[in-house]
Amino acid sequence: MERYESLFAQLKERKEGAFVPFVTLGDPGIEQSLKIIDTLIEAGADALELGIPFSDPLADGPTIQNATLRAFAAGVTPAQCFEMLALIRQKHPTIPIGLLMYANLVFNKGIDEFYAQCEKVGVDSVLVADVPIEESAPFRQAALRHNVAPIFICPPNADDDLLRQIASYGRGYTYLLSRAGVTGAENRAALPLNHLVAKLKEYNAAPPLQGFGISAPDQVKAPIDAGAAGAISGSAIVKIIEQHINEPEKMLAALKVFVQPMKAATRS
Protein backbone atom coordinates (compact mmCIF):
# COMPACT_ATOMS: atom_id res chain seq x y z
CA MET A 1 0.00 0.00 0.00
CA GLU A 2 2.84 2.37 0.90
CA ARG A 3 4.16 2.06 -2.65
CA TYR A 4 1.16 4.03 -3.93
CA GLU A 5 1.66 6.74 -1.32
CA SER A 6 5.32 7.19 -2.16
CA LEU A 7 4.59 7.09 -5.92
CA PHE A 8 1.93 9.80 -5.70
CA ALA A 9 4.20 11.93 -3.47
CA GLN A 10 7.09 11.64 -5.95
CA LEU A 11 4.86 12.44 -8.92
CA LYS A 12 3.43 15.46 -7.15
CA GLU A 13 6.93 16.74 -6.53
CA ARG A 14 7.78 16.30 -10.22
CA LYS A 15 4.41 17.82 -11.26
CA GLU A 16 3.42 14.66 -13.08
CA GLY A 17 0.42 12.38 -13.17
CA ALA A 18 0.58 8.59 -13.16
CA PHE A 19 0.36 6.53 -16.31
CA VAL A 20 -0.83 3.01 -15.47
CA PRO A 21 -1.07 0.29 -18.13
CA PHE A 22 -3.27 -2.79 -17.77
CA VAL A 23 -2.44 -6.21 -19.19
CA THR A 24 -3.62 -9.75 -18.50
CA LEU A 25 -0.98 -11.92 -16.82
CA GLY A 26 0.18 -14.74 -19.09
CA ASP A 27 -1.03 -13.15 -22.35
CA PRO A 28 0.10 -14.46 -24.84
CA GLY A 29 2.28 -16.81 -22.77
CA ILE A 30 4.25 -16.54 -19.55
CA GLU A 31 7.66 -15.66 -20.99
CA GLN A 32 6.39 -13.01 -23.41
CA SER A 33 4.04 -11.62 -20.75
CA LEU A 34 7.01 -10.98 -18.43
CA LYS A 35 8.86 -9.25 -21.30
CA ILE A 36 5.77 -7.12 -22.01
CA ILE A 37 5.64 -6.00 -18.37
CA ASP A 38 9.36 -5.13 -18.34
CA THR A 39 8.85 -3.14 -21.56
CA LEU A 40 5.89 -1.20 -20.13
CA ILE A 41 7.98 -0.24 -17.09
CA GLU A 42 11.04 0.72 -19.19
CA ALA A 43 8.80 2.89 -21.39
CA GLY A 44 7.57 4.88 -18.39
CA ALA A 45 4.71 3.07 -16.62
CA ASP A 46 4.36 4.43 -13.07
CA ALA A 47 2.35 1.49 -11.72
CA LEU A 48 0.91 -1.76 -13.08
CA GLU A 49 -2.67 -2.98 -13.23
CA LEU A 50 -2.73 -6.72 -13.95
CA GLY A 51 -5.53 -9.16 -14.65
CA ILE A 52 -5.63 -12.83 -13.69
CA PRO A 53 -7.28 -14.84 -16.48
CA PHE A 54 -10.87 -15.69 -15.57
CA SER A 55 -13.45 -17.69 -17.51
CA ASP A 56 -16.29 -15.16 -17.28
CA PRO A 57 -14.98 -11.57 -17.33
CA LEU A 58 -18.15 -9.46 -17.00
CA ALA A 59 -16.72 -5.94 -17.10
CA ASP A 60 -14.35 -6.63 -19.96
CA GLY A 61 -14.97 -5.79 -23.59
CA PRO A 62 -13.91 -8.14 -26.42
CA THR A 63 -10.26 -7.02 -26.50
CA ILE A 64 -9.52 -8.03 -22.92
CA GLN A 65 -11.69 -11.15 -23.17
CA ASN A 66 -9.45 -12.24 -26.06
CA ALA A 67 -6.37 -11.64 -23.91
CA THR A 68 -7.87 -13.94 -21.30
CA LEU A 69 -8.55 -16.61 -23.95
CA ARG A 70 -4.94 -16.38 -25.18
CA ALA A 71 -3.64 -16.82 -21.63
CA PHE A 72 -5.94 -19.83 -21.15
CA ALA A 73 -4.75 -21.27 -24.47
CA ALA A 74 -1.19 -21.00 -23.15
CA GLY A 75 -2.31 -23.00 -20.10
CA VAL A 76 -1.81 -20.16 -17.61
CA THR A 77 -3.21 -20.87 -14.12
CA PRO A 78 -3.79 -18.55 -11.14
CA ALA A 79 -0.88 -20.31 -9.35
CA GLN A 80 1.44 -19.42 -12.24
CA CYS A 81 0.14 -15.84 -12.15
CA PHE A 82 1.29 -15.58 -8.54
CA GLU A 83 4.71 -16.96 -9.51
CA MET A 84 4.89 -14.28 -12.20
CA LEU A 85 3.90 -11.59 -9.68
CA ALA A 86 6.72 -12.69 -7.37
CA LEU A 87 9.21 -12.42 -10.27
CA ILE A 88 7.92 -8.98 -11.29
CA ARG A 89 8.18 -7.75 -7.71
CA GLN A 90 11.72 -9.12 -7.34
CA LYS A 91 12.83 -7.31 -10.48
CA HIS A 92 10.93 -4.07 -9.79
CA PRO A 93 10.94 -3.51 -6.02
CA THR A 94 9.28 -0.06 -5.95
CA ILE A 95 6.55 -0.05 -8.62
CA PRO A 96 2.99 -0.37 -7.29
CA ILE A 97 1.33 -3.56 -8.54
CA GLY A 98 -2.47 -3.78 -8.62
CA LEU A 99 -4.68 -6.73 -9.49
CA LEU A 100 -7.98 -6.28 -11.28
CA MET A 101 -10.05 -9.41 -10.94
CA TYR A 102 -13.29 -11.21 -10.13
CA ALA A 103 -14.68 -12.54 -6.85
CA ASN A 104 -14.68 -16.20 -7.91
CA LEU A 105 -10.90 -16.22 -8.10
CA VAL A 106 -10.74 -14.84 -4.56
CA PHE A 107 -13.31 -17.35 -3.26
CA ASN A 108 -11.51 -20.28 -4.91
CA LYS A 109 -8.57 -19.77 -2.59
CA GLY A 110 -10.53 -18.58 0.43
CA ILE A 111 -10.69 -14.81 0.91
CA ASP A 112 -8.07 -14.55 3.65
CA GLU A 113 -5.70 -16.99 1.97
CA PHE A 114 -5.96 -15.04 -1.29
CA TYR A 115 -4.94 -11.73 0.29
CA ALA A 116 -2.21 -13.46 2.32
CA GLN A 117 -0.77 -14.72 -0.96
CA CYS A 118 -1.00 -11.22 -2.46
CA GLU A 119 0.98 -9.86 0.47
CA LYS A 120 3.57 -12.63 0.14
CA VAL A 121 4.33 -11.91 -3.53
CA GLY A 122 4.28 -8.12 -3.11
CA VAL A 123 0.92 -7.09 -4.60
CA ASP A 124 -0.11 -3.60 -3.43
CA SER A 125 -3.79 -3.45 -4.34
CA VAL A 126 -6.75 -5.56 -5.44
CA LEU A 127 -9.87 -4.38 -7.24
CA VAL A 128 -12.60 -7.04 -7.27
CA ALA A 129 -14.68 -5.89 -10.24
CA ASP A 130 -17.90 -7.74 -9.48
CA VAL A 131 -18.23 -6.98 -5.75
CA PRO A 132 -20.32 -3.87 -5.01
CA ILE A 133 -19.14 -1.71 -2.13
CA GLU A 134 -22.04 -2.76 0.12
CA GLU A 135 -20.89 -6.40 -0.13
CA SER A 136 -17.19 -5.63 0.15
CA ALA A 137 -16.63 -5.97 3.92
CA PRO A 138 -15.05 -9.47 3.94
CA PHE A 139 -12.79 -8.52 1.02
CA ARG A 140 -11.63 -5.16 2.29
CA GLN A 141 -11.11 -6.44 5.84
CA ALA A 142 -8.94 -9.32 4.61
CA ALA A 143 -7.08 -6.91 2.31
CA LEU A 144 -6.23 -4.54 5.15
CA ARG A 145 -5.16 -7.44 7.40
CA HIS A 146 -2.57 -8.29 4.77
CA ASN A 147 -1.41 -4.75 3.87
CA VAL A 148 -3.19 -4.82 0.52
CA ALA A 149 -5.13 -1.74 -0.58
CA PRO A 150 -8.80 -2.42 -1.40
CA ILE A 151 -9.66 -0.48 -4.57
CA PHE A 152 -13.16 0.73 -5.38
CA ILE A 153 -14.71 1.89 -8.64
CA CYS A 154 -16.27 5.34 -8.67
CA PRO A 155 -18.86 5.41 -11.50
CA PRO A 156 -19.65 8.67 -13.35
CA ASN A 157 -23.10 8.81 -11.72
CA ALA A 158 -21.89 8.24 -8.13
CA ASP A 159 -24.07 9.94 -5.52
CA ASP A 160 -22.83 11.52 -2.33
CA ASP A 161 -23.35 8.42 -0.20
CA LEU A 162 -21.31 6.27 -2.54
CA LEU A 163 -18.53 8.87 -2.74
CA ARG A 164 -18.31 8.93 1.06
CA GLN A 165 -18.16 5.11 1.21
CA ILE A 166 -15.45 4.97 -1.45
CA ALA A 167 -13.46 7.59 0.45
CA SER A 168 -13.91 5.75 3.71
CA TYR A 169 -13.15 2.17 2.56
CA GLY A 170 -10.76 2.62 -0.36
CA ARG A 171 -6.98 2.78 -0.07
CA GLY A 172 -4.16 3.13 -2.60
CA TYR A 173 -6.10 4.82 -5.38
CA THR A 174 -9.71 5.27 -6.53
CA TYR A 175 -10.66 3.80 -9.92
CA LEU A 176 -12.58 6.62 -11.57
CA LEU A 177 -14.77 5.33 -14.37
CA SER A 178 -14.81 7.51 -17.50
CA ARG A 179 -18.19 6.09 -18.50
CA ALA A 180 -20.54 3.19 -17.87
CA GLY A 181 -20.33 -0.03 -19.88
CA VAL A 182 -17.50 -2.44 -20.63
CA THR A 183 -13.83 -1.69 -21.19
CA GLY A 184 -12.61 -0.85 -24.67
CA ALA A 185 -10.56 1.66 -26.60
CA GLU A 186 -13.30 1.98 -29.26
CA ASN A 187 -15.43 3.96 -26.84
CA ARG A 188 -13.48 7.08 -26.09
CA ALA A 189 -13.38 8.37 -22.54
CA ALA A 190 -16.17 10.82 -21.74
CA LEU A 191 -15.72 14.35 -20.43
CA PRO A 192 -13.36 14.97 -17.52
CA LEU A 193 -15.17 14.28 -14.26
CA ASN A 194 -14.19 17.48 -12.44
CA HIS A 195 -17.08 17.44 -9.98
CA LEU A 196 -16.35 13.85 -8.88
CA VAL A 197 -12.64 14.55 -8.50
CA ALA A 198 -13.45 17.59 -6.35
CA LYS A 199 -15.84 15.59 -4.14
CA LEU A 200 -13.40 12.69 -3.73
CA LYS A 201 -10.74 15.19 -2.64
CA GLU A 202 -13.16 16.83 -0.22
CA TYR A 203 -13.88 13.44 1.40
CA ASN A 204 -10.15 12.53 1.49
CA ALA A 205 -10.50 9.58 -0.86
CA ALA A 206 -7.43 7.80 -2.24
CA PRO A 207 -6.13 9.61 -5.37
CA PRO A 208 -8.36 9.01 -8.42
CA LEU A 209 -6.99 7.34 -11.56
CA GLN A 210 -9.33 7.53 -14.54
CA GLY A 211 -9.85 4.38 -16.60
CA PHE A 212 -12.01 2.97 -19.45
CA GLY A 213 -11.48 4.19 -23.01
CA ILE A 214 -8.06 5.80 -22.47
CA SER A 215 -6.22 5.25 -25.74
CA ALA A 216 -4.51 8.54 -26.67
CA PRO A 217 -2.23 11.06 -24.91
CA ASP A 218 -4.94 13.77 -24.83
CA GLN A 219 -7.13 11.36 -22.85
CA VAL A 220 -4.34 10.99 -20.29
CA LYS A 221 -3.88 14.74 -20.04
CA ALA A 222 -7.60 15.59 -19.65
CA PRO A 223 -8.26 13.77 -16.34
CA ILE A 224 -4.98 15.07 -14.89
CA ASP A 225 -5.96 18.62 -15.89
CA ALA A 226 -9.29 17.95 -14.12
CA GLY A 227 -7.42 17.10 -10.90
CA ALA A 228 -7.15 13.30 -11.17
CA ALA A 229 -3.85 11.69 -10.17
CA GLY A 230 -3.46 9.89 -13.48
CA ALA A 231 -4.96 7.49 -16.02
CA ILE A 232 -5.21 3.75 -16.62
CA SER A 233 -5.07 2.34 -20.15
CA GLY A 234 -5.91 -1.30 -20.85
CA SER A 235 -7.69 -2.18 -24.08
CA ALA A 236 -5.43 0.00 -26.24
CA ILE A 237 -2.36 -1.83 -24.90
CA VAL A 238 -3.90 -5.28 -25.16
CA LYS A 239 -4.85 -4.48 -28.76
CA ILE A 240 -1.15 -3.90 -29.58
CA ILE A 241 -0.36 -7.34 -28.12
CA GLU A 242 -3.10 -8.82 -30.32
CA GLN A 243 -1.89 -7.06 -33.47
CA HIS A 244 1.66 -8.38 -33.14
CA ILE A 245 0.86 -11.77 -31.70
CA ASN A 246 3.25 -13.59 -34.09
CA GLU A 247 6.05 -11.00 -33.92
CA PRO A 248 7.20 -10.82 -30.29
CA GLU A 249 10.01 -8.30 -30.88
CA LYS A 250 7.82 -6.02 -32.98
CA MET A 251 5.18 -6.22 -30.25
CA LEU A 252 7.59 -4.96 -27.60
CA ALA A 253 8.78 -2.13 -29.87
CA ALA A 254 5.17 -1.10 -30.60
CA LEU A 255 4.30 -1.12 -26.89
CA LYS A 256 7.23 1.20 -26.20
CA VAL A 257 6.11 3.57 -28.96
CA PHE A 258 2.61 3.64 -27.47
CA VAL A 259 3.56 4.09 -23.80
CA GLN A 260 6.20 6.82 -24.14
CA PRO A 261 3.84 9.59 -25.40
CA MET A 262 1.14 8.42 -22.94
CA LYS A 263 3.60 8.93 -20.07
CA ALA A 264 4.81 12.22 -21.58
CA ALA A 265 1.20 13.49 -21.47
CA THR A 266 1.25 13.22 -17.65
CA ARG A 267 3.89 15.95 -17.37
CA SER A 268 2.45 19.41 -16.97
UniProtKB/Swiss-Prot annotation:
Keywords, alphabetical: Amino-acid biosynthesis, Aromatic amino acid biosynthesis, Lyase, Tryptophan biosynthesis
InterPro entries cross-referenced by the UniProt entry: Aldolase_TIM, RibuloseP-bd_barrel, Trp_synthase_alpha_AS, Trp_synthase_suA
Catalytic residues (positions): 49 (proton acceptor), 60 (proton acceptor)
A GO term from the CC aspect: cytosol
Pathways involved: Amino-acid biosynthesis; L-tryptophan biosynthesis; L-tryptophan from chorismate: step 5/5
GO molecular function ontology, one term from the record: tryptophan synthase activity
Leading EC class: lyase
Source domain of life: Bacteria
Catalysed reaction, written as an equation: (1S,2R)-1-C-(indol-3-yl)glycerol 3-phosphate + L-serine = D-glyceraldehyde 3-phosphate + L-tryptophan + H2O
SUPFAM superfamilies assigned: Ribulose-phoshate binding barrel
EC number from the UniProt entry: 4.2.1.20
One Pfam family here: Trp_syntA
Quaternary structure annotation from Swiss-Prot or TrEMBL: Tetramer of two alpha and two beta chains.
Task performed by this protein: The alpha subunit is responsible for the aldol cleavage of indoleglycerol phosphate to indole and glyceraldehyde 3-phosphate.
NCBIfam families: trpA
Family named by the database record: Belongs to the TrpA family.
Name under which the protein is recorded: Tryptophan synthase alpha chain
